[in-house]
Amino acid sequence: MSRQVARLIGSLSSKARRCSTGGSEVFPSCQSLTSLTQSRSFASDPHPPAAVFVDKNTRVLCQGITGKNGTFHTEQAIEYGTKMVAGVTPKKGGTEHLGLPVFNSVAEAKADTKANASVIYVPAPFAAAAIMEGIEAELDLIVCITEGIPQHDMVRVKHALNSQSKTRLIGPNCPGIIKPGECKIGIMPGYIHKPGKIGIVSRSGTLTYEAVFQTTAVGLGQSTCVGIGGDPFNGTNFVDCLEKFFVDPQTEGIVLIGEIGGTAEEDAAALIKASGTEKPVVAFIAGLTAPPGRRMGHAGAIVSGGKGTAQDKIKSLNDAGVKVVESPAKIGSAMYELFQERGLLKQ
């Protein structure tokens, strides 16, 4: 979709927002405009919470919308059908970008558009402050794509997150979250996703895309895909996502992609074992041959003090009844075989 079309869609939705707040006298075409933008309206009617963090009713604002990355990925989100309702860039409030209203602060954007989620495309030195602003505005969800945020900044963010219960952070240093066919928040390529029955949670962005492509190829599709990021201090972990997938009726199977470093995979294995879930789980752990003490890509991908090895993680997952594959190329076929064995394939 061209930038002009993205602007048109955004402009229509912006005017529909003004209509919904009593602007029919100023905008006489509001009645017809509302019907054109019904799927992107900003109704104040409460919706049931999303099964796994996002759905078609999620209203998203973009922090850093006027930057190169913010502009490009907002266009992609609008094209995908995500309800992008606003942008936030300090000192640019009162303007429009891609047809969306731009505000000086998250609080102003939330009050005016009823946004309940944010995606952050802000440079690393300022990203933690952007996250804190979203927390202070009490958004339901913040998705931070930014890589390279100083870890001491994220320690402060983690403290703020742990001091409240309203806002959830996904990331940083992640591809984002997508519910295929409904809502895309992040940098993942939308076209490889297909609405389906597999929940995917991963510390690696590119391996997430591999799992998506394979589950699409075998006809299973995805219910929700969450990239939790590879930094040591992130907002959402495997356990948070698994708890959602276990009770989500659309999710019939789960793919977990981990890597060396930390104990997140061991914690996930303990939860899977304790839950007694009957949903098949396939896992892949990256970094089997990584030397101890050397960081492998992500800031959190490091074996230190004899902990966080791929071997330990694989053993924990195997003990929990998880099918662990030795190559990411086998994720899709392994899940399909488990569905066959358990009679879960619909004829």
Swiss-Prot record:
Enzyme Commission number: 6.2.1.5
Protein family per UniProt: Belongs to the succinate/malate CoA ligase alpha subunit family.
Cell compartments where the protein resides: Mitochondrion
Major enzyme class: ligase
Catalytic site: H298
NCBIfam families tied to this protein: PRK05678.1, sucCoAalpha
UniProt: CoA binding residues: T66, G67, K68, N69, K92, I145, T146, E147
Organism per entry: Arabidopsis thaliana (Mouse-ear cress)
Upper taxonomic lineage: Eukaryota, Viridiplantae, Streptophyta, Embryophyta, Tracheophyta
InterPro entries recorded: Cit_synth/succinyl-CoA_lig_AS, Citrt_syn/SCS-alpha_CS, CoA-bd, CoA_lig_alpha, NAD(P)-bd_dom_sf, SUCC_ACL_C, Succinyl-CoA_synth-like
Database matches in HAMAP family: Succ_CoA_alpha
A biological-process GO annotation: tricarboxylic acid cycle
Gene3D superfamilies for the chain: NAD(P)-binding Rossmann-like Domain, Succinyl-CoA synthetase domains
Keyword RNA-binding assigned: no
Keywords from the named record: Ligase, Mitochondrion, Nucleotide-binding, Transit peptide, Tricarboxylic acid cycle
Reaction catalyzed: succinate + ATP + CoA = succinyl-CoA + ADP + phosphate
Protein name per its UniProtKB record: Succinate--CoA ligase [ADP-forming] subunit alpha-1, mitochondrial
